[in-house]
């Protein structure tokens, strides 16, 4: 939830900024020259298609791609999980996309929450000015730096930062992207997690659909309107097929082709693409630490291991994302 009301924002600003909160689909991912940032799916009004006690089914005519986009959010009895499916029909060509939950860490003391993701091939800091001082924006991570451990990410000053501890580095705005390892029999899904005070939030995905995870680390580094240095302690933990948050035109240039990492997907007018994720919460004991693994524990259940060695089980149909 952004620290401003929609009515405080200039009419010229994108709708997305006016109501910045929660979780939203980005199709395509990133800014566009002649359309709103992150696409109509993140800015336009959705229609109610169907609903019920445990289902919300929404739809959207996308004027930019010509696609019919559906969002299905489902709850299941006895579970603390949201099953999210996006169906995209009628699009043609290569598009980037992503799911964009924004987690609010402002209730946590500095550095006390723990953020982690499933094993990744490599990580990168955005290779340019994600936060440009010309626009009164400031970043602290070393542009373009590659890393293999979120606890050791190069700073522009020469030291390393531990990105698993948050909130941290107030006054800065940074973007990193991790390329997930492919699925195995033992690890059929990829995951992201944030451990808070007594509970954790986690998401599950198919790495073939969402090959990368982006962390948008937003802790007061933007000083132009509507940010005004007050968007503190937030983090977008975003599952994407994109090149960072660059435009779809840049993603179509395959900037990571040499690494074998797709940044767009081919859509065909005569087919429907289904993109599925699960977001869930679970209680954790004190001193659980950052999540080090989330693996299947049989059908309809996962076991989550913390840095302390403690484990918790959560009822989640992980097969939904495969």
Briefly describe each language-model feature range.
Residues 1-83, 94-322:
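Surface-exposed acidic/polar loop and edge beta-strand patches at domain peripheries
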Residues 86-91:
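Asparagine-centered strand-capping/turn motif at beta-strand->loop junctions
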């Amino acid at each position: 939830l952004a620290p401003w009301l929609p009515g405080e924002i200039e009419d010229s600003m994108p709708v997305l900024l006016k109501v910045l909160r929660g979780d939203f689909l980005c199709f395509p991912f990133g800014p566009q020259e002649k359309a709103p940032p992150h696409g109509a799916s993140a800015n336009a009004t959705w229609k109610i298609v169907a609903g019920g006690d445990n289902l919300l089914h929404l739809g959207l005519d996308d004027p930019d791609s010509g696609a019919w986009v559906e969002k299905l959010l489902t709850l299941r009895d006895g579970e603390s999980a949201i099953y999210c499916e996006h169906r995209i029909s009628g699009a043609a060509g290569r598009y980037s996309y992503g799911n964009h939950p924004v987690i609010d860490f402002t209730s946590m003391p500095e550095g006390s929450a723990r953020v982690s993701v499933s094993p990744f091939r490599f990580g990168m800091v955005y290779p340019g000015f994600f936060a440009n001082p010309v626009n009164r924006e400031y970043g602290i991570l070393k542009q373009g730096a590659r890393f293999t451990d979120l606890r050791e990410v190069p700073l522009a000053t020469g030291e390393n930062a531990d990105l698993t501890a948050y909130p941290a580095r107030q006054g800065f705005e940074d973007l990193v992207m991790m390329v997930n390892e492919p699925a195995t029999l033992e690890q059929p899904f990829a995951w992201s997690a944030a451990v808070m005070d007594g509970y954790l939030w986690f998401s599950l995905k198919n790495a073939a659909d969402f090959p990368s995870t982006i962390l948008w680390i937003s802790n007061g580094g933007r000083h132009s309107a509507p940010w005004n240095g007050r968007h503190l302690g937030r983090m977008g933990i975003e599952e994407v097929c994109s090149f960072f948050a660059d435009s779809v035109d840049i993603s179509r240039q395959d900037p990571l082709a040499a690494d074998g990492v797709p940044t767009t997907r081919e859509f065909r007018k005569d087919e429907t693409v289904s993109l599925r994720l699960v977001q869930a919460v679970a209680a954790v004991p004190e001193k659980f630490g950052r999540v080090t693994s989330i693996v299947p524990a049989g059908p309809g259940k996962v076991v989550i291991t913390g840095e302390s060695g403690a484990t918790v089980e959560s009822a989640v149909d992980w097969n939904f994302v495969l």
